[in-house]
Amino acid sequence: MNNIAVFAGSFSPFTKGHEDIIRKALPLFDKIIIAIGQNYNKKDVFSVEQRMNWIQTLYQPNPKIEVLAYEGLTVDMCKKVGAGYLIRGLRNAADFQMEHEMYLINKQLAPDIDTVLIPASPQLAAVSSSLVRELWQLKADYTPFVSYKLPDIE
């Protein structure tokens, strides 16, 4: 496996908290693949194309970052792209518990792929895509939490 990492999520939308994790991870890896996964437990408000466009615009022309969309297991996609690492952000103890459980399952499914946990910066630890979506849907100011404009709601 190369020094390639995958940062996977639904990113609906991609927040400044996600940007913080990428900023911290960039010096650690030769390449980071931001992978937009289809989460069947979530109803996506924004299309995959919108999310890809927002993220690509944020990171152009950084040669160390690639953006892709995928379906299926994250570890299977990691194997397909030759990534040896999964990046996961941690905001709180609940995130740690969930990520630890996912780590245990992923290790059984793909023993060669390691998980790197990166804590959120304190000022961004409360930021989540769910929070941003709620603010956006209520037509409240979401701009402190994302680096781009979301589409207007009719």
State each model region's role.
Residues 1-154:
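Nucleotidyltransferase catalytic core that binds NTPs
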